């Protein structure tokens, strides 16, 4: 049994034993309801889902057989409800919960294919149902989590099936299907033991190649990282050693951080289509979790993974430093957190699995090494300005301190002392305190544990840590400051977490030796003094608000910002020994009696409450009794009304003095005392019984008072008193019951997953009410509920008050008393008894146990109250309907009466929010290496677990009877309840908004619990929308209730409500006010978003108009509203159209539905295309896209079986006829084009592709009505759009798709009808008109219908040629999109070739007439680039390959074209052509085919284009450089002819180079560079050398290409080539080239540090060192900066070697200088180089102080007297050193000797800095 259930109050715990049987009963019920032959039976099973979830959340003990039976049934139901998304969402989610909870006990076999089919059918198909997008989103989430849960149950062989299924999607990396493919692989691929044999070396190589095919795309990265992380974790048999350098290189480059002053994010990340990002987990950030998990599971004894991790940390640690924060901080913070969590989980797994192999387990050396590395990150991030990072660091410290205390604890201690000493950065103290709080337990355990299994190392003294705790506690006293909330809370957290560890707090015990500075009682005194001072200085957050809403606890930051204050008091007072507790109690009691602090009611109340909770008898005597007496004596002196219910009415009237007012001070004092009392007695229980008389008197006097504020305080007291008497709550919660076996001074903490030896965990003790307490509670009920009810009736029936004001006051007080009692007894007052339907006396069902206290009163009392309140409500609505306080009170009473258990539910959900208890301070991880006790789960202090058990009980009590009547139709709601529902229905249409909202909330809760009442409510509310003269507030109230989920759900199954709802909304256009219109539209939009299809019985009722039912005419009624001609407002016309569409779409699923309606509707929407209303036109487009299907007119492909002729005729003739009649009308298409062109808005900013462009005139609501979810799941284009020269278009694929479907539906007649309007619009002047023409033409060309060839020859081809040769420029983007659409491949992977593609390509490729202008040339190239992107390279037919070859030749000849625009186009097309060819070649190598061996392929293999370009490039670079040199020399005036000639040549070369740079840039931008890396590596030199030339445009392009190059990681195969280029350019004669080589080197080394060989690194180091003594000063300084970066980068042996050499060199120069005093023979460059070597070493450790640093800095400072470039270098370097070490200088300066500090001070200008 789960610990929380074991610890429930005894009466409840007894009941839980019946839960196993009741779960078995539920499973039987579900089984009976589900009939596999009837798919509609799903709806009947839905009501049981919340009951099944109850058992899971109640942590009940269930039998595994029942669970596995339920899971099997659930999966059947899930698969059988194909089109019922809502049912799939509900069942999917509950299955996920069950499978996850019982995953280790179930033995299932789940097939993956049906799950995949569900996913494809609902989310990736082109013809989805009508469901709203919110539902679709939930459905996607549900299905994907179900797949994730079922992965572990996939049978053997599933992995290879899944891989081969999705491999085909991954063939072409430049098609969006590859993104989908990677998402599916990540989602489905199982790594369970049955499938592990699938993961072989070959598979890994394959994955790494695929991963490399799309660079710079975080979506892609995260999919593959996640797949690999799972394989690495679960398949421990794979040897990863050889892949480590490559993988770590990937990991490093996935963190987008700024390297060497570069930017911190990819310049062009590959664009992932919106729907793919939306559907698959779209973490666009770095996949930190998967990276961390992979790294942790790489670690093994003897593996090189640890060195690699160290290198990774060395490179990343600088970005954790507070001064280097940025966008990347989040992903780095996650990385640190997941590293530590994964490490902890792995240790736990190895601890619990005794047979794991020692060869793969982490031993002591591996643990020490790992902790050492992670501490570097912790050290950097500890004082980060980023809140999350500093908290993560503290949590990580805490977890690691249990693994390696000898490393972590000294670090915590030194950091704490550092924070104490700092004077400038005070925020550090808060963080340091948090660290000590989080590591408190491990510090105490390692110091006090008797089992000294861990030796903390010789020089570390145990006392040191105990002192640390002592110091932190004494400092904590200073930290309590009313003006510094964060620090105060951190202090309280610290005290609470340290004392949670102690068994008892007492002076006499020696164990608390850490209280070095004083005895514990002195500390306690000081603490209470500070606390009292803090309370006296608190400022309340807001003015304490009057009226009902002021709770007793609207507190200051101590209460509002977290539970630390209260927890600390409870723990402290609970752990004190007897004598110390009395000492504290005296002090607190004195404080409470002498102070009145209205600003700190809650805080003082909680202080008293904690005292009472700890030892009730004494605390009640010392705190509660004096306060009670004081408040009663004050109450006697104040004026009374006498409505408090003591004594009879006559005596009171005579008693009443003339109205005298109460002084505000006295009122505030009484209010304060009563409220503090009410909080203090919360846990009083039976110790309050002796003061029974006083309490009754205090409450009655408070209600009798004439002050409303005092009445309210009395209400608090009564509530609290009732709760204290009859509720179950834990007592002794904070006492220590079991001591730690290894360290008796500490408390032993408990894990909820108890292993056998912990069985004797002490139970928690509960307050179970005694007979006297229940009796007292019943007396209070008589006094304040029964008598108040009688008063209420008498006020309402016999007018006893002549004065309206008196009557109001009397009503207020009476209602307040009733409310107060009901809120106090919660669900202890029995619920209404429902009336059985068929005179049968039936036992109520039992689901789960739960009660919040013992029973008081009886169900009769509840019924009597309900009937009285019904009468009172009637009276109030007649007489006092404008008095909101009375109405709100009465609604609260109704809520408490009707919604049994909801008060507990509210309390539970509020408390759940307040749980910051999960903080690391009170969690001890399962694997504890300090005491060597390992448990199955995390351990926590007993009080925290009792708290959870208490909340668990509260939740159970709110749920125990909630679902009893929802599942059982045999009970009808009791009569008093129907009264309440009627009253609430009236109140939720009230004209005060507050009243409406409250009543609405309460009503919705009631309807949810009693679904039988729904239809009555829906009918009466929709009636309000239809009535002509209804007030605005009635409409608002009705809409609020109708838009609730319960109602929307109810509409899917109840025909009557459904038709009434729709007609109600559609016939509500007569409401004038803006607010009501807005409410109605919002309701309609919400209905659309959550629309869940219709159940069979509604569809039946729609058709059954034959039998004369009313809703049958629904379709025709709505149809008549949806025509333009009807005089409706345009938005209602739109809504009617939408409803019509929803009905038709829902009914398509039903096979018996008549096709006639479908045809009529399709015709109706086709006509609507030329409607006058723009919104209706947009909806018509959506509708036609859904209703028109591919049809018989499509040409038969080779692989499709031909359909026999007569079938073709019948199949679709009706729709064909219906549509043909419409579009054959004269001028139909012309008008349609006209009206569609108005929707195209040419504004540049909002016309992003695929977005209907109409964003500028569509509000959000209109969008929700006119669009469908699927419009972006079938989005076009299906390939990434990255070509900027195409411009932004306003081409809407959904328009093109209508024309395509029309052509497929009706064949050639459509083409003929389109001919003349197309000819007219293609030549139109306006861009929108040309755009419509482009869409229509694209659709027709892509339709593949019979007869298309003839039309192409007769007129379409001419039309296209005219477009190409046309002079107009502005519509190029649209026509390019048209061509792109027309040649787009068909099918999911875009590999099926459309029939017209070849013709269209030939038409574009055809050479232009010689007279063509550059505009036309540019246009042709734009069209070409658009068309070529769409080809699918792996499977190109030979014709397309030939086309590629022809084009390549043409383009290479044209690379020096005179127009810049055309050069760019040529560069872009070249990158597409070359990468297409390369991809095809690599595909042919892997999957060679027989017909593949044609002459074309051998032509491709020669790669002539590559040779040509490479040869030309090196020649061009030389020419350009020479030309620029001769330009600079050539100042003479007489230019000879040869020179001019060469100038022209060099200009051609410049143009040629520009084209080449465009080629490089577009290869990177498009992500196609992966296939062209060898080509690009060859062009590295031109890019580096042409950054500074006299040709501005060329240099700009070179710089752009250079920026992109910096991000590229080259694979090992091309590295040698790149390094060769780098080394040779570092020797270049031009110093600018040397400098740009250095710039490239910095990022190059960072990106490739894992994959470079030792020799290569050596060469590079040598080269850079040589540049330290370069003749050009800029190069020297640059080289020093690069070296500093290289030294940070983790190659310690190189760095150390260089440091020693440079130090020796500089030292010898310095000595020679000192000897000669005269200027030496050595050149300036030599000395400068030596100094720069020192500078590089000093700057390579910006924040640390390694042992060699002081000498280096001092030596550097000695050079300050040198001449100019050297002097400034030294000064800058020393200043930089000083800046970066300023934070920790206080400690670091101890590393220097006096002399060294003096030399430093001489160099520094402001010596005060260095004390």
Curated annotation (Swiss-Prot):
Q: How does it assemble?
A: Interacts with the 26S proteasomes.
Name of this protein:
Proteasome activator subunit 4
Among Pfam families, the record links this protein to: HEAT_PSME4_mid, PSME4_C
Spell out the disulfide connections. none
Entry function: Associated component of the proteasome that specifically recognizes acetylated histones and promotes ATP- and ubiquitin-independent degradation of core histones during DNA damage response. Recognizes and binds acetylated histones via its bromodomain-like (BRDL) region and activates the proteasome by opening the gated channel for substrate entry. Binds to the core proteasome via its C-terminus, which occupies the same binding sites as the proteasomal ATPases, opening the closed structure of the proteasome via an active gating mechanism.
> What are the GO BP annotations of this UniProt entry?
DNA repair
List GO terms (cellular component aspect).
Answer: proteasome complex
Describe how expression is induced or repressed. Upon MG132 treatment.
Highest taxon above the source species: Eukaryota
**Keywords recorded for this protein, A-Z:** DNA damage, DNA repair, Proteasome, Repeat
Q: Cite the GO molecular-function annotations of the record.
A: lysine-acetylated histone binding; peptidase activator activity; proteasome binding
According to the record, what happens upon gene knockout?
A: No visible phenotype.
> Which regions are annotated as HEAT repeats?
563-599, 1156-1193, 1442-1479, 1613-1650, 1655-1692, 1746-1783
Free-text note on domains in this protein's UniProt record: The bromodomain-like (BRDL) region specifically recognizes and binds acetylated histones.
């Amino acid at each position: 049994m789960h610990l929380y259930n074991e610890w429930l109050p005894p009466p409840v715990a007894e009941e839980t034993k019946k839960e196993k049987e009741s779960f078995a009963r539920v499973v039987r019920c579900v089984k009976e309801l589900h009939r596999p032959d009837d798919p509609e039976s799903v709806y009947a099973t839905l009501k049981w889902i919340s009951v099944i979830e109850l058992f899971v959340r109640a942590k009940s003990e269930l039998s595994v057989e029942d669970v596995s039976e339920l899971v099997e049934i659930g999966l059947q139901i899930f698969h059988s409800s194909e089109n019922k998304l809502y049912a799939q969402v509900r069942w999917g989610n509950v299955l996920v919960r069950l499978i996850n909870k019982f995953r280790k006990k179930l033995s299932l076999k789940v097939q993956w294919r049906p799950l995949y089919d569900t996913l494809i059918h609902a989310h990736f198909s082109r013809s989805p149902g009508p469901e709203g997008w919110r539902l679709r989103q939930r459905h996607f989430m549900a299905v994907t989590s179900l797949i994730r849960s079922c992965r572990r149950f996939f049978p053997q062989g599933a992995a290879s099936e899944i891989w081969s299924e999705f491999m085909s999607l991954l063939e072409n990396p430049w098609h969006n299907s590859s993104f989908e493919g990677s998402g599916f692989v990540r989602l489905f691929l199982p790594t369970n033991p049955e499938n592990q044999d699938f993961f072989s070396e070959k598979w890994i190589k394959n994955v790494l190649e695929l991963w490399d095919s799309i660079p710079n795309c975080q979506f892609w990265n995260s999919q593959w990282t996640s797949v690999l992380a799972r394989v690495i974790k679960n398949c421990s048999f794979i040897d990863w050693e050889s892949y480590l350098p490559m993988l770590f290189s990937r990991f490093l480059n996935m963190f987008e951080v700024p390297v060497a002053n570069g930017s911190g994010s990819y310049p062009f990340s590959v664009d992932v289509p919106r729907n793919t990002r939306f559907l698959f987990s779209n973490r666009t950030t770095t996949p930190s979790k998967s990276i961390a998990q992979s790294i942790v599971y790489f670690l093994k004894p003897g593996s090189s993974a640890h060195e690699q991790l160290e290198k990774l940390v060395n490179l990343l640690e600088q970005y954790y430093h507070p001064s280097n924060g940025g966008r990347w901080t989040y992903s780095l913070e996650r990385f640190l957190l997941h590293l530590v969590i994964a490490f902890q989980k792995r240790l736990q797994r190895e601890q619990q699995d005794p047979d794991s192999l020692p060869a793969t387990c982490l031993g002591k050396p591996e643990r020490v090494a790992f902790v050492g590395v992670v501490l570097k990150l912790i050290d950097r991030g500890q004082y980060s300005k980023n809140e999350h990072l500093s908290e993560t660091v503290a949590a990580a410290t805490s977890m690691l301190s249990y693994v390696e205390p000898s490393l972590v604890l000294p670090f915590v201690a030194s950091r704490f002392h550092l924070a104490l000493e700092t004077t400038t950065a005070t925020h550090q103290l808060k963080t340091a305190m948090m660290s000590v709080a989080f590591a408190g337990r491990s510090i105490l355990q390692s110091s006090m544990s008797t089992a000294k299994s861990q030796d903390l190392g010789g020089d570390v003294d145990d006392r040191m840590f105990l002192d640390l705790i002592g110091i932190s506690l004494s400092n904590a006293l200073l930290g309590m400051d009313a003006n510094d909330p964060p620090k105060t809370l951190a202090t309280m957290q610290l005290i609470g977490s340290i004392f949670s560890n102690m068994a008892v707090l007492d002076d006499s015990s020696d164990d608390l030796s850490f209280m070095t500075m004083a005895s514990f009682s002195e500390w306690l005194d000081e603490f209470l003094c500070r606390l009292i001072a803090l309370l006296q200085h608190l400022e309340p957050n807001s003015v304490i608000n009057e009226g009902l809403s002021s709770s007793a606890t609207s507190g200051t930051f101590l209460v509002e910002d977290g539970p630390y204050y209260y927890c600390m008091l409870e723990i402290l007072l609970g752990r004190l020994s007897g004598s110390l507790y009395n000492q504290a109690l005296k002090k607190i009691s004195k404080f409470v009696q002498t102070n009145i602090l209205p600003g700190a009611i809650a805080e003082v109340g909680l202080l008293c409450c904690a005292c009472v909770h700890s030892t009730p008898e004494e605390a009640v005597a010392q705190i509660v009794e004096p306060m009670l007496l004081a408040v009663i004596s004050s109450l006697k002196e104040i004026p009374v009304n006498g409505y408090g219910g003591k004594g009879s009415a006559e005596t009171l009237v005579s008693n009443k003095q003339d109205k005298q007012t109460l002084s505000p001070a006295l009122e505030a004092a009484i209010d304060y005392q009563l409220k503090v009392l009410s909080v203090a007695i919360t846990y009083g229980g039976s110790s309050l019984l002796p003061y029974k008389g006083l309490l009754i008197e205090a409450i009655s006097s408070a209600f009798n008072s004439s002050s409303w504020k005092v009445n309210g305080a009395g209400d608090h007291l009564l509530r609290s008193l009732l709760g204290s008497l009859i509720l179950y709550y834990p007592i002794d919660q904070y006492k220590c019951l079991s001591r730690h076996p290894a360290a008796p001074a500490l408390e032993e903490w408990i894990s909820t997953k108890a292993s056998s030896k912990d069985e004797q965990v002490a139970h928690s003790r509960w307050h179970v009410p005694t007979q006297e307490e229940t009796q007292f509670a019943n007396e209070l009920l008589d006094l304040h509920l029964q008598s108040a009810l009688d008063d209420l009736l008498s006020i309402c029936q016999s007018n006893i008050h002549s004065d309206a004001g008196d009557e109001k006051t009397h009503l207020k007080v009476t209602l307040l008393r009733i409310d107060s009692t009901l809120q106090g007894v919660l669900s202890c007052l029995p619920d209404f008894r429902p009336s059985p339907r068929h005179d049968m006396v039936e036992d109520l069902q039992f689901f789960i146990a739960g009660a919040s206290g013992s029973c008081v009163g009886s169900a009769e009392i509840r019924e009597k109250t309900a009937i009285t309140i019904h009468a009172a409500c009637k009276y109030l609505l007649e007489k006092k309907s404008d008095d909101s306080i009375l109405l709100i009170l009465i609604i609260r009473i109704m809520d408490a009466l009707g919604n049994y258990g909801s008060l507990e539910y509210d309390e539970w959900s509020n408390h759940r929010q307040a749980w910051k208890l999960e903080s690391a301070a009170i969690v001890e991880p399962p694997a504890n290496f300090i005491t060597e006790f390992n448990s199955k789960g995390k351990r926590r202090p007993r009080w925290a677990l009792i708290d959870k058990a208490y909340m668990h009980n509260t939740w159970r009590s709110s749920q125990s009877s909630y679902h009893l009547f929802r599942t059982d139709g045999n009970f009808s709601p009791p009569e008093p309840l129907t009264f309440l529902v009627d009253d609430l229905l009236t109140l939720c249409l009230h004209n005060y908004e507050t009243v409406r909202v409250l009543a609405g909330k309460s009503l919705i809760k009631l309807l949810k619990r009693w679904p039988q009442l729904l239809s009555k409510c829906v009918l009466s509310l929709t009636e309000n929308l239809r009535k002509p003269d209804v007030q605005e507030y009635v409409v608002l109230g009705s809409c609020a209730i109708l838009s609730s989920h319960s109602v929307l759900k109810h509409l899917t199954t109840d025909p009557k409500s459904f038709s009434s709802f729709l007609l109600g909304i559609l016939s509500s256009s007569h409401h004038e006010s803006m607010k009501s219109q807005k409410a109605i539209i919002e309701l309609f939009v919400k209905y659309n978003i959550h629309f869940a299809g219709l159940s069979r019985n509604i569809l039946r009722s729609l058709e059954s108009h034959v039998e004369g039912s009313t809703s049958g005419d629904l379709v025709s009624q709505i149809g008549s509203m949806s025509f333009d001609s009807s005089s409706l407002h345009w938005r209602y016309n739109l809504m009617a159209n939408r409803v019509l569409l929803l009905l038709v779409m829902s009914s398509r699923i039903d096979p018996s539905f008549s096709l006639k309606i479908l045809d009529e509707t399709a015709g109706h929407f086709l006509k609507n295309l030329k409607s006058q209303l723009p919104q209706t036109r947009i909806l018509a487009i959506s509708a036609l896209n859904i209703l028109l299907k591919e049809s018989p007119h499509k040409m038969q492909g080779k692989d499709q079986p031909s359909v026999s002729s007569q079938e073709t005729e019948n199949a679709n003739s009706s729709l064909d006829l219906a549509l043909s009649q419409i579009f054959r009308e004269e001028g139909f298409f012309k008008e349609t084009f006209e009206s569609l062109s108005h929707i195209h808005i040419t504004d540049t900013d909002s016309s992003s592709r695929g977005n209907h462009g109409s964003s500028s005139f569509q509000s959000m609501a209109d969008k929700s009505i006119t669009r469908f979810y699927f419009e972006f799941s079938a989005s076009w284009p299906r390939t990434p759009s990255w070509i900027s020269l195409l411009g932004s278009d306003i081409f809407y694929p959904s328009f093109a798709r209508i024309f395509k479907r029309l052509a497929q539906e009706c064949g050639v007649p459509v083409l003929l009808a389109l001919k003349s309007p197309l000819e007219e619009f293609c030549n139109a002047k306006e861009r929108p008109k040309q755009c419509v023409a482009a869409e229509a033409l694209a659709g027709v060309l892509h339709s593949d219908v019979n007869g298309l060839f003839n039309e192409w020859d007769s007129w379409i081809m001419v039309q296209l040629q005219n477009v190409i040769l046309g002079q107009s420029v502005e519509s190029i983007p649209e026509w390019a999109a048209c061509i792109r659409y027309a040649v787009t491949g068909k099918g999911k992977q875009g590999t099926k070739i459309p029939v017209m593609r070849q013709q269209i390509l030939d038409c574009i490729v055809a050479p232009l007439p010689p007279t063509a202008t550059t505009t036309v040339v540019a246009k042709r190239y734009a069209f070409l680039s658009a068309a070529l992107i769409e080809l699918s390279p792996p499977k190109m037919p030979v014709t397309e390959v030939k086309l590629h070859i022809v084009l390549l030749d043409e383009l290479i000849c044209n690379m020096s074209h005179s127009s810049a625009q055309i050069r760019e186009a040529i560069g872009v097309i070249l990158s597409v052509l070359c990468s297409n060819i390369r991809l095809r070649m690599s595909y042919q190598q892997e999957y060679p085919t027989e017909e593949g061996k044609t002459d074309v392929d051998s032509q491709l293999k020669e790669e002539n284009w590559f040779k040509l370009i490479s040869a030309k490039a090196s020649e061009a670079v030389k020419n350009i450089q020479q030309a620029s040199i001769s330009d600079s020399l050539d100042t003479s005036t007489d230019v000879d002819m040869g020179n001019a000639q060469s100038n022209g040549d060099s200009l051609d070369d410049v143009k040629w180079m520009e084209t080449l740079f465009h080629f490089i840039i577009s290869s990177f931008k498009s992500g196609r560079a992966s296939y062209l890396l060898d080509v690009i590596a060859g062009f590295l030199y031109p890019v580096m050398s042409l950054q500074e030339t006299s040709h501005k445009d060329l240099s700009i392009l070179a710089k752009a290409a250079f920026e992109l190059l910096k991000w590229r990681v080259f694979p090992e195969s091309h590295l040698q080539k790149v390094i060769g280029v780098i080394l040779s350019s570092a020797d270049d004669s031009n110093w600018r080239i040397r400098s740009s080589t250095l710039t490239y080197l910095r990022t190059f080394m960072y990106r490739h540090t894992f994959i470079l060989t030792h020799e290569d690194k050596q060469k590079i180091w040598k080269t850079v060192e040589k540049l330290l003594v370069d003749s050009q000063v800029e190069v020297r300084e640059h080289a020093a900066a690069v070296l500093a970066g290289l030294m940070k980068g983790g190659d310690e042996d190189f760095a150390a070697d260089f440091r020693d050499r440079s130090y020796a060199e500089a030292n010898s120069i310095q000595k020679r200088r000192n000897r000669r005093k005269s200027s030496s023979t050595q050149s300036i460059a030599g000395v400068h180089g030596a100094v720069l070597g020192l500078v590089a070493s000093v700057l390579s450790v910006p924040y640390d102080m390694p042992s060699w640093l002081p000498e280096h800095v001092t030596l550097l400072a000695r050079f300050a007297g040198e001449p100019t470039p050297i002097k400034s270098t030294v000064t800058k370097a020393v200043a930089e050193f000083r800046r970066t070490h300023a934070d920790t200088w206080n400690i670091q300066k101890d590393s220097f000797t006096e002399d060294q500090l003096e030399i430093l001070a001489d160099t520094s200008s402001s010596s005060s800095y260095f004390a």
